[in-house]
Structure formats: C-alpha cells, structure tokens
Amino acid sequence: MEKYENLGLVGEGSYGMVMKCRNKDSGRIVAIKKFLESDDDKMVKKIAMREIKLLKQLRHENLVNLLEVCKKKKRWYLVFEFVDHTILDDLELFPNGLDDQVVQKYLFQIINGIGFCHSHNIIHRDIKPENILVSQSGVVKLCDFGFARTLAAPGEVYTDYVATRWYRAPELLVGDVKYGKAVDVWAIGCLVTEMLMGEPLFPGDSDIDQLYLIMRCLGNLIPRHQELFYKNPVFAGVRLPEIKESEPLERRYPKLSEVVIDLAKKCLHVDPDKRPFCAELLHHDFFQMDGFAERFSQELQMKVQKDARNISLSKKSQNRKKEKEKDDSLGEERKTLVVQDTNVDSKFKDSKVFKIKGSKIDGEKVDKGNRAAVSMTVGPSHIKAVPSTSLRDCSNVSVDHTRNPGMAIPPLTHNLSAVAPGINSGMGTIPGVQSYRVDEKTKKYCIPFVKPNKHSPSGIYNMNVTTSVSSEKNLLQANKKRGEYSKTDVRLPELNYNHLPELRALEGIARNSRLIRKENKILSESRIPSLAAIDLHTPNIAVHQVSGSPLSDGSEADSPWMEHQH
C-alpha cells in the first residue's frame, strides 16, 4: 500500500471505509476500501472474502472494476477504479427528480449490470442509489458487493440478510431464507419512481412500518409470506397492519406515464416468482419505444471507450509530469555541479583566468607562467602567475601584500599617462588638470605596485603648474565680494583638509599667500605650485611630478618589497 497516496476519505460504514488515493507510479486515481481488522471480526472477514471472490470473476462495463487486493496488518484493502459520482448525488442535486431521458439511460445500465451478475448466479442484495456510480461520461457502475453472494443450492438456506430497509423486498422483511434474484428486481422497481419523482418510494422507519407502506401501495402479502411473518420470532406478538385505504402507484404519482407505472409495478410485484428477469425488463416498452435500446447500446460503447481514453490520457499526463520532474531534478543537479565547479580552490580559478589574460612576454617567462598557472606546490609556498594590470583594471581592487608574500610583479609601463588614459575622463576639467573634488567612484583606486592605503604618485595629481594657477585665479575672481583688488591679485581659497589630507604639509605656502593679500602687493604673474598631492617624504617622486616628467624606473624602489622563493 506504500505505492498509494491518500487523498481523502470518501465514505465509511460499519465494516470499513473508502478512501480516494493516487497511484504514485502511474498517477491513476483509485478508490481503496479498507476493511476493519478482519482477523478479529469474523463477520468483517466473511464480507471481505465474499466481495473479493465475486469481483474477481465479474468483469463488466456496468460493474466497478476491482484492480488489486492486498492485506496489511490484519486488514484487507480492495483497490477499485475511482468514480466519485453516484445517483444519490444526482437526487440531492435535483430533489424533484431527474430528467426522463437520464432515468431511461440509468435504468437501462442498472438492469444490464444486474442481469450480468444474475447470469453468473450472483445476487447483489444491496441495490440503492449510493451504490450506483456514474462516470463523467455517464456510464453506470454497480459497486459495494459486500452483501452479494452466489445463489443457494436447492434446499440450502441463506443467512440473515441485513441491508438498507427502503429497498428491501417483502420476502426479506418477513425473514424468508429462500430468496433469489427477484430481490434485486424489487430494488429496481423502487429506483424507477425515486429517480423520476425525487423521493423514496417506501421510506419505512422499521420493518413493520416498511411492510405497512408496501401493503398500502401494492396490497396484501402472499400467503406464504404472511405465514413466515407470524412464525418469525422477531415479530412475536405483532400482527400485520390492516390497510383501510390503499394508495396505488397511479394515484400516488399521477404525473408518471403509463409505461413507467407498468415497469414499476412489474418490478414491485409482491410475489417474487412473478417478477420478471432482467433480460425481460430490457425488452420492456420503456426501453424499446423509439428504438432507444438499440441506439443507446451503441452510444454506451462510445461512452465506455471515452472513459478508457480518459484513463489512458491521465496516465500519460502523469508520466509526462514525472518525466518533467525528473528533467527538472537533473537540471538542478547539473546546476549544483556547476556551482560546485565554480567553488573550487582559488588556485585553479586563478590558473584558468591567467591562462587567458596572461601578459605577452618572452617564451621563457610564458613557460614559467604556465607552470605557475596549475598552482603546483613547490616546497612550503605556492607560486602564482599575475597578469599585467593597468590602473583602470584595479579601480576597486585591494591587494593584500601580507597575505600574498610570493606574488610576482609584472614589468612596469614607463608611460603612465598611456597606462591610465581614462582617469581624467568625465571630470569636467581641462587636460592635465585634476580637480580634487573627485567623484565618489574614483576616490578608491589601487595600483598593484603601490603600497596599500597610499595614493598613487602618478597620473591623478600630475598637473601643469601654470595652467592650474590660472584656473584657480578665475575661480577666486568669481567669488570675490569685498574690497577692490587689482586684476592680477590672486586669492587662494580656504583649504578643506577633509578632501586632501596630504596638503597639511603645504600650510606654509597658504600662510604666505594670506600675508601677500594683506599687504596688497601686486603680482605680475603667479608661479604658485599646483595643489597637488606631493609626497614630501619621497623627493624623487615630487621632483618628477612638478616637472611633469614621467616616473622613472627608479620609482620601483617605492614599491612593496616582494620575496621570490624558488
């Protein structure tokens, strides 16, 4: 039973319950009847064994199909095809009765299914609206064969029969132990009027009340049944009810046609020996008029085939769904493998990148880089190849030299202006001049050959002195508000140390400019150096910056010391 998924309870009774389930393998929806612990209850075991035995030998389009039988933990499980609709559901939906044509089709199939059972000497004994299933295509299927049994041999008696009272024949009510197929025909007669009028024909509250309703509509019981009644200890001290005023079917249901009344009366004959067989009922005028029987037989075959196709399509749809789920799971596994592949050791990731972006050097260095690219361990340390990187490539990169003591330094490019041609682009300044109000994105930069936490000595603050002064002069003249000065006067703005912390070393220059302003001295031409980020502690770099010459190879002395281990 592990291959079935429980989808909910359909119904339950005295001997067990019916559950709606799904086959996990095929996806087919089934109905599973779970009996109570049959090993502890002989009656439950008897009913389960009887239904299993009968349904295994019964295969018909108007009988529910038994698919599988299994036993688990003293319980029997019967797996049926699932049909979630019954005639009782129709009657609850249409309390005033069903359409005549619908009833005609239902009755034809009910009689056809019961006739098939009778042809195999099996009586159902519990025909009622809730035991008659209707598929989506309108195919009727009899179910619940728990009370069904084979006909007794001559002289053999049946056990006590307990079923739904409203559809019970008179011979069953009085306790006759020799009954036969006619009990099912009686139940058919009760269904005829109930489906057309929407109300049960004999809704008795007790067995004696049931007998009273039958006798009032159909007359007195036959002598044999009356004798059995008075011999039955169940009715000891009770007399058969006297009928003062009868109410036949014609008077009770005046709207029903004569053909329908005739069909019901033949099925409801008080003498079971005078009730017709199912084959005779199928030839009744109710089914033969207008060629209904022949026409509907062909239609019924199409309905059965349609149901079979629906089951097949359901299986295929479920199989496609399972295949899609498998494909999705395989896709997820592939994604997981890709993620795992991208999360490999950084040695291999570095080797893949550097093989593509390696700098063009002589053949000997290439061979060394390739050997380093596979990240082979030589001694206690690792040797890694590093690509040549421009200033533009390292705009947001920080190099931790303490964590990478063995990193090799690529050859430096001497023309630094060519290395970083786009640094000043988009800043709104004249060529060669870099405004100290830099954009937030350009405040952080890194050059692999400069110590961390230290600004670059080239490029950004490499300016023309004369051009810088004239630009600052124009800015100061536009902001001048007080006093009259000569056109050649220059006022230096107050420096904000938040922007250029490196300018603290130039306080002397700013102080001299304020003294010049107080003395109102006229300057013919200002030769004040640009407010560049000059590192006074590295005179070689400062000299090259002021003169505008490129950084010589001697600047490598200011690069972080790297130890090469072989």
Curated annotation (Swiss-Prot):
InterPro entries: CDK, Kinase-like_dom_sf, Prot_kinase_dom, Protein_kinase_ATP_BS, Ser/Thr_kinase_AS
An example Gene Ontology molecular-function term: ATP binding
Signal peptide start and end residues: none
CC annotations in GO: cytoplasm; nucleus
Catalyzed reaction equations: L-seryl-[protein] + ATP = O-phospho-L-seryl-[protein] + ADP + H(+); L-threonyl-[protein] + ATP = O-phospho-L-threonyl-[protein] + ADP + H(+)
Residues that hold ATP according to the record: 10-18, 33
Short motif ([NKR]KIAxRE): ranges: 45-51
PROSITE patterns for this protein: PROTEIN_KINASE_ATP, PROTEIN_KINASE_DOM, PROTEIN_KINASE_ST
Subcellular location: Cytoplasm; Nucleus
Active-site residues, Swiss-Prot/TrEMBL: 126 (proton acceptor)
Composition bias type Basic and acidic residues, residue spans: 320-334
Domain notes: The [NKR]KIAxRE motif seems to be a cyclin-binding region.
Family recorded in the similarity comment: Belongs to the protein kinase superfamily. CMGC Ser/Thr protein kinase family. CDC2/CDKX subfamily.
Protein name: Cyclin-dependent kinase-like 2
Organism: Oryctolagus cuniculus
Organism lineage string: Eukaryota, Metazoa, Chordata, Craniata, Vertebrata
